[in-house]
């Protein structure tokens, strides 16, 4: 896989800052051009630190009332649970930005997973005005973390959800705790205007190498399936995560 951009920072702190800078830049660009920025958030420690920076150091860099927040996946837990991706984003960023409720489009992790996935699909179809079964939303920016096993969102190796071609969101059950989750599907991710991976730590080095330079095996390395049809991929990582690249 050849990324549109591969950016390697010296350390994690530099990565957090650069990620916040990139998100703020993309947001301002989209708002200037389209009057709105649709941002699909991810969970994890690296995004959390960047979210905190967006709500503090970069608070004045973005017209936040024009940003619509979505999620790439969610653990099936209440929003106040420490494992909740919405809860993390709310604590680190959203609660500090004086947003209107209608700007926040969260997956309802507290509901029954299949029902929550169907409801999220309905919300996406309504917001993006998708009328046909084969239509997919076009987010301005989708943020993705990367699991040690090369999973993205909650699309794990060898999971049937990797092959979903029509639905926008699915309920998945995986071995990693919390085992029940909701995830956007790969066609949604690949319909984005821009996808940005945020990856840090030596534990992710093998996954990064296998996705970017390894043999084609998307069943084993789901990150290889991330190929925006009309958009670009930005890989933003620290030196430790990039240490396996040649």
Language model features by range: what are they?
Residues 141-187:
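Class I SAM-dependent methyltransferase SAM-binding "motif I" and its flanking Rossmann-like core
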Residues 1-3, 63-140:
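Ligand-binding beta-strand-loop-alpha-helix segment within the catalytic cores
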Residues 41-46, 144-148, 200:
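Glycine-rich beta-strand-to-loop/alpha-helix junction loops that act as flexible
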Residues 1-39:
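N-terminal glycine-/serine-/threonine-rich phosphate-binding loop
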Residues 117-118, 152-158, 207-211:
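A short secondary-structure junction signal
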Residues 32-57:
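Glycine-rich N-terminal segment of FAD-binding domains in flavoprotein oxidoreductases
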Residues 52-63, 87, 91, 157-165, ...:
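A glycine- and small-aliphatic-rich helix-loop capping segment at beta-alpha/alpha-beta transitions
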Residues 187, 193-246:
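ATP/nucleoside-binding phosphotransfer catalytic cores, i.e., glycine-rich phosphate-binding loops
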